[in-house]
Regions:
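A short, surface-exposed helix-loop junction/capping segment
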Residues: 64-66, 266-269, 320
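Short amphipathic alpha-helical segments
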Residues: 59-63, 72-80, 87, 214, ...
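Extended, helix-rich architectural segments
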Residues: 1-127, 436
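Alpha-helix boundary/N-cap detector
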Residues: 11, 19-36, 42, 58-62, ...
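Extended, regular secondary-structure scaffolds
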Residues: 81-84, 88-89, 94-207
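Extended, charged amphipathic alpha-helical segments
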Residues: 186-315
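C-terminal helix-loop subdomains that flank or include functional centers
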Residues: 247, 256, 261-264, 279, ...
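Conserved aromatic-histidine-acidic binding/catalytic patches
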Residues: 21, 46, 51, 55, ...
């Protein structure tokens, strides 16, 4: 509003024109979909998918070790999360496999399996992979035949040149060839080349809509509710001093000045907001809970879990049952994607190193399966394993694997035999002493 200023020199009062400014309203954004997608991703591939395989000979065992080595060198453990996250939020993702010249991979592999290369031509190619998705700037064009089999795959993307300019590139991959074009003044075809794999080196996952589309209305309403509530707090939360009566004068120093009020009903009090906004709290909690419940996503936070107490593994299984059911549904696409990846790598290793793996790649059977994330209760697992082994239901080997020590099964079995032999020897020595 306009302000009046008294000029002591002229003895006149001037009025300064009011200046108006635009005050921005609160706009609170809530990354609800991002949190749900991250939790779903962690439950789906937070625990590495299992690989079930029983090699029938040494060649198949070497091939299985080679598949695991390819997974490790390509950091598939982390790429799985990128694939699932892109599939849930971006609707589609593709994984492209190619070869590079790198003989160090095979040197490390032969050293690990403690054997020497037995072929005539030592392999020099290494399998590499790259992820394509819309948020990474890729436009994906899968091509399927009438039976639903993908027979070709195309990708459009931008490539930055040395002068910071960008050109559009297009590539098409078939079961044998890779074709590329650059769009500068017109489409210029680059020299096509063969990828050298017996199968199409592209894995593709698609879903018809983003995973969190059904909860978008909850998030929009929640953001509007909290934004309006924030504006309400800014205008009404901080108390105002209400003065009732006639102002007779001021007392005290400037800093601690007091107002003297007179007249009937003279009073001074703060205006405070005494009403508790229960309706706002109720709607916010309801919308948030509905968003997580509709997406079968558990709310993993301190506030949510602090009332659980000392929960056992069984209690956590019931708590995460909805998330595990969602993982089973994800397996329709992601499980198939992972299985096709394993099958492709097996065939690719057979083509890269035919001397060692050509025959084994045609006979080996590797099955992969999603393992939903679970907070393991070690005490429950050990108790179950001990009961099953002592009851004759499981072998000692199976009990060790169930208890979570699968990486050291042979070592543990050998140590158990040694300890048992030592105990039997001690018992025999005591028996001889007692007899004498």
């Amino acid at each position: 509003e306009a302000e009046k200023v008294f000029d002591e020199k002229t003895g006149k009062t001037y009025e300064i024109e009011a200046k108006y400014k635009t005050e921005p309203v609160n706009r609170i954004s809530i990354p609800l979909e991002q949190d749900i997608v991250n939790i779903q991703t962690a439950f789906t591939v937070g625990t590495e998918p299992s690989m079930d395989c029983t090699p029938t000979d040494d060649d198949e065992k070497k091939l299985l070790d080679a598949v695991k080595a390819v997974f490790k060198s390509n950091k598939i453990k982390y790429q799985n999360k990128k694939v699932v996250r892109a599939w849930l939020s971006e609707q589609e993702a593709a994984e492209y496999w190619y070869v590079t010249d790198d003989d160090s991979f095979w040197a490390k592999f032969w050293k690990k399996v403690k054997t020497t290369f037995g072929g005539k031509v030592k392999p020099t190619k290494k399998l590499k992979s790259v992820l394509w998705s819309p948020f990474r700037g890729d436009k994906l064009y899968p091509f399927f035949n009438d039976e639903g089999k993908m027979i070709a795959f195309s990708r459009e993307y931008k490539k930055k040149l040395m002068d910071d300019s960008e050109i559009t590139c297009f590539m098409t991959i078939t079961d044998k060839m890779v074709y590329q074009w650059d769009l500068s003044k017109g489409y210029e075809e680059r020299t096509p080349f063969t990828h050298g794999f017996p199968k199409l080196p592209v894995l593709y996952a698609y879903r018809p809509e983003p995973y969190c589309k059904k909860i978008k209305t909850f998030r929009v309403r929640l953001e509007k509710l909290l934004s309006n509530y924030a504006d309400c707090i800014d205008y009404h939360f901080f108390p105002l001093l209400k003065l009732i009566g006639d102002v007779e004068g001021f007392m005290g120093k400037v800093k601690d000045r007091m107002v003297k009020l007179t007249g009937e009903g003279a009073d001074a009090q703060y205006l405070t907001w005494n009403q508790v906004p229960d309706t706002v709290r109720f709607e916010a909690e309801t919308l948030t809970n509905m968003a997580y419940d509709m997406s079968n996503t558990p709310r993993i936070s301190f506030e949510t879990l602090k009332g659980v107490g000392k929960a056992s593994g069984t209690a956590f299984r019931f708590m995460f049952m909805g998330a595990h059911m969602a993982v089973e549904n994800h397996g329709e696409v992601i499980g198939e994607f992972l299985q096709r990846r394993v099958n492709f790598i097996v065939s690719a290793l057979g083509s890269i190193n035919p001397t060692e793996f050509s025959k084994a790649s045609q006979t080996i059977d590797i099955e992969t399966e999603l393992v939903p994330y679970m907070i393991d209760d070690l005490n429950d697992k050990v108790t179950t394993a001990v009961s099953a082994v002592s009851g004759g239901i499981w072998s000692t080997r199976e009990g060790i694997m169930f208890a979570g020590n699968a990486d050291r099964v042979e070592e543990e079995l050998a140590e158990i035999k040694e300890e048992q032999a030592a105990k039997n020897e001690q018992i025999g020595n005591k028996g001889q002493k007692n007899a004498s």
